[in-house]
């Protein structure tokens, strides 16, 4: 990451974590410690039992989500919150839910019913797009965290490769057909958004999955040609993403190429997180976040799009609702990692505001003013935690 001079004073009014007027290293350490403790508490509450006795995890501690969601689990696992003793069982369950053709899924009900589409199979007509990538994420993290060599078996890695190739593409990028109304949902945090054409965030998820698969193939001692093919595909996707979605006049990436071409705040931050955005574009994204901070951040939580933008089409067509204007904690770590390039003190404000809101109202799925929804939501803790740990290491020069 491009290093910048740290400012001692925090932009705006900052709620201190450590009782100091300025936010320092100890405060970031305290924020991380608080998220770890709160995340551990929530993940225990989110434990559920399948009918076969297997331990799985709902996305939140309450009863709103009555299934084990793939992407939420993958993101929570990447944040380091899933106990190691349960990871193999969940990975086995998710791998077993992949169809012989290589189609993924959205979630699995506790009775074992596989839901390929969002809304318990009520939204869209075909399997959700991100299911093709998040099984790879789960297998990768399970292998990484447990060291279990069963996840390097040929049948496992071949299934992951089949899934990535099965995902619909056009022009070399993930694709939803504009000719079929809401043919399928994109990724889960946009599952109510009826975007079509080539998809920006899904392209990022595929890049990440291809890189992870290459690492797994390497660890398994697979042929160099297989490993090189996955790395080359990831490299090609990076080039295509930057050629297709970047809006140079605006300074952010667009979410899709046909319907819902709005600018993607979450995705632009994630592109920096993954190293997909070149340095000059990463700096422009960071400056956009700094200069438009008040419109895209609320209590340390992040809007999907710039202020004043709304998706062309959603399942409910309501503005300032759900994924069409609410503010979410899930992407805050990516956002802070990006903003650090140009405004470290504003990062400190974001972290302090996030923790203050979480302490006051709990880690919710999303907020809008005084409105909160779905309390004790796991990715609202796990994904910022992952981001802040990386930020902490970078600030310490590790």
Where are these regions (language model features)?
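Asp/Glu-centered strand-loop micro-motifs enriched in Gly/Pro and often flanked by an aromatic residue
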Residues: 40-70, 78
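Active-site acid/base region of carbohydrate-active enzymes
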Residues: 26-44, 70, 81, 94, ...
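The feature captures the catalytic groove of carbohydrate-active enzymes
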Residues: 57-63, 106-134, 165-232, 239, ...
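Boundary at the C-terminal end of the N-terminal hydrophobic targeting segment
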Residues: 22-24
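Bacterial N-terminal signal peptides that target proteins for export
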Residues: 1-11
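Aromatic-rich carbohydrate-recognition surfaces in CAZymes
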Residues: 66-174, 203, 328-339, 347, ...
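Non-catalytic carbohydrate-binding regions of carbohydrate-active enzymes
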Residues: 39-48, 95, 100-101, 110, ...
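Bacterial N-terminal signal peptides
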Residues: 11-19
């Amino acid at each position: 990451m491009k290093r910048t001079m740290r400012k001692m004073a925090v932009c705006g009014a900052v709620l201190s974590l450590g009782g100091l007027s300025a936010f320092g290293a100890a405060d970031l350490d305290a924020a991380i410690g608080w998220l770890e403790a709160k995340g551990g508490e929530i993940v225990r509450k989110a434990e559920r039992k399948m009918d076969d006795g297997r331990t799985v995890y709902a996305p939140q501690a309450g009863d709103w989500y009555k299934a084990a969601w793939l992407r939420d689990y993958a993101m929570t696992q990447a944040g380091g919150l899933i106990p190691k003793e349960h990871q193999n069982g969940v990975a086995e369950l998710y791998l077993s839910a992949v169809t012989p053709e290589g189609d993924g899924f959205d979630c699995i009900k506790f009775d074992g019913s596989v839901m390929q589409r969002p809304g318990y199979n009520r939204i869209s007509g075909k399997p959700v797009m991100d299911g093709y990538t998040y099984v790879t994420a789960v297998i990768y993290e399970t292998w990484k965290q447990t060291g279990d060599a069963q996840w390097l078996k040929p049948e496992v890695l071949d299934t992951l490769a089949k899934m990535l190739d099965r995902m619909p593409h056009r022009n070399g990028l993930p694709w939803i057909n504009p000719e079929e109304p809401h043919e399928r949902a994109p990724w889960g945090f946009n599952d109510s958004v009826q975007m079509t054409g080539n998809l920006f965030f899904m392209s990022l998820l595929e890049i990440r999955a291809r890189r992870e698969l290459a690492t797994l193939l390497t660890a398994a001692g697979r042929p160099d040609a297989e490993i090189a093919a996955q790395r080359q595909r990831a490299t090609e996707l990076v080039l295509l993403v930057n050629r297709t979605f970047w809006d140079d006049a605006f300074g952010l990436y667009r979410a899709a190429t046909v319907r819902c071409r709005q600018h993607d705040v979450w995705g632009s931050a994630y592109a920096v997180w993954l190293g997909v955005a070149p340095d000059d574009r990463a700096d422009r994204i960071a400056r956009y976040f700094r200069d438009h901070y008040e419109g895209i951040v609320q209590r340390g939580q992040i809007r999907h799009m710039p202020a004043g933008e709304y998706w062309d089409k959603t399942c409910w067509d309501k503005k300032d609702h759900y994924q069409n204007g609410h503010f979410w904690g899930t992407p805050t770590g990516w956002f802070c990692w990006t903003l650090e390039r140009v405004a470290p003190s504003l990062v400190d404000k974001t972290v302090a505001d996030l923790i203050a809101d979480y302490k006051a109202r709990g880690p919710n799925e999303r907020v809008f003013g005084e409105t909160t929804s779905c309390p004790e939501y796991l990715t609202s803790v796990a994904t910022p935690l992952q981001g802040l740990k990386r930020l902490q290491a970078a600030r310490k020069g590790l």
